C-alpha cells in the first residue's frame, strides 16, 4: 500500500494537498495529521480515497513518539510526505510571548525535522517529500522575525536534504508561496495588521498546491508560484 502523509491537513494549504493528492492513482491511502479531529473527519468524507485520521498536536513531543510507534507497527510504504503544519505570529519579537515565539520554532522546524527523519526509513525509490516553507524564507522580516527565520531553516534544510537523498532517488521540494488566501492571516495578524500591498499578491490554495505537486514530480528543489514571488527571490540575492 502506497501511503501519503500530510500534516496540517485540517485547513488551508494542507487541506488542499489532501484533496489534490486524493486524485492521484499512485496513492492508496492518505494519513491526515492535524489537531482538529472533527475537521479531519469531515474532509476525509469528501475525498474518494482511503484515509487515516491522526488527530495530534505536533508541538507535543509525546505525540511525535506516538507517531514513531505507529510507523514501526504499520511499516507503511510512504510515497509522499507533505510537511504543511506550521504557523506565524506577526509582531515585534520583544512584544510577543515566549511561548508563541518558541512554539513557531517547535512546529515549523523541530516537528518538521522529526517527521522527515521518522518517515525516511519507510520511503522507497521515487518517493517525494514536500516541505511547505514561505517566500518569507528569502530574507529577514522585521515584525515577523522568528517566522521568517524558521522558514529559512525549512528552505535550506530541504535543499540540502534533496542533495543528500538524490542517490536514493528520493526528492525533496521546498514550497515557497507568497500570501495565500487561507486562515493563516487570522492567526498571524493578531499581533499587527498585514501590509495592505500583500493583498494584491494573494494566491489561491489550489494554484499553489497544483504547482507544488507538479514541481515535485519534476524533481525540482524549490516550488514558487507567481511571477511576483519569483521576482522577489531574484531581488533578494542582491540585498
Which residue stretches match the model-derived regions?
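Conserved glycine-rich cofactor-binding loop
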Residues: 10-11
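Conserved glycine-rich Rossmann-like NAD(P)H-binding loop of the short-chain dehydrogenase/reductase
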Residues: 22, 26-42
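Conserved NAD(P)H cofactor-binding loop of Rossmann-fold oxidoreductase domains
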Residues: 84-89
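Substrate-binding pocket helix/loop in short-chain dehydrogenase/reductase
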Residues: 92-102
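Active-site helix of classical SDR
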Residues: 116, 150
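Residue(s) in the substrate-gating loop at a strand-loop-helix junction
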Residues: 134
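C-terminal helical subdomain
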Residues: 174, 195-233
Amino acid at each position: 500500500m502506497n501511503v501519503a502523509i500530510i500534516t496540517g491537513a485540517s485547513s488551508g494549504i494542507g487541506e488542499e494537498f489532501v484533496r489534490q493528492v486524493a486524485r492521484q492513482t499512485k496513492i492508496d491511502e492518505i494519513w491526515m495529521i492535524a489537531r482538529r479531529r472533527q475537521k479531519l473527519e469531515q474532509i476525509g468524507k469528501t475525498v474518494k480515497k482511503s484515509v487515516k485520521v491522526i488527530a495530534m498536536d505536533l508541538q507535543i513531543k509525546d505525540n511525535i513518539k506516538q507517531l514513531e510507534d505507529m510507523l514501526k507497527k504499520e511499516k507503511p510504504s510512504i510515497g509522499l510526505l507533505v510537511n504543511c503544519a506550521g504557523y506565524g505570529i506577526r509582531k515585534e519579537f520583544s512584544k510577543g510571548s515566549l511561548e508563541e515565539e518558541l512554539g513557531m520554532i517547535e512546529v515549523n522546524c523541530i516537528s518538521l525535522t522529526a517527521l522527515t527523519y521518522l518517515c525516511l526509513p519507510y520511503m522507497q525509490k521515487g518517493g517525494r517529500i514536500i516541505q511547505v516553507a514561505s517566500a518569507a524564507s528569502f530574507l529577514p522580516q522585521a515584525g515577523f522575525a522568528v517566522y521568517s527565520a524558521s522558514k529559512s531553516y525549512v528552505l535550506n534544510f530541504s535543499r540540502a536534504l534533496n542533495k543528500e537523498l538524490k542517490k536514493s532517488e528520493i526528492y525533496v521540494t521546498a514550497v515557497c508561496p507568497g500570501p495565500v488566501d487561507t486562515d493563516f492571516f487570522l492567526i498571524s495578524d493578531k499581533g499587527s495588521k498585514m501590509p495592505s500591498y500583500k493583498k494584491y499578491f494573494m494566491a489561491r490554495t489550489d494554484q499553489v498546491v497544483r504547482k507544488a505537486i507538479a514541481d515535485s514530480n519534476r524533481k525540482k528543489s524549490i516550488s514558487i508560484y507567481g511571477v511576483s514571488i519569483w521576482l522577489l527571490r531574484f531581488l533578494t540575492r542582491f540585498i
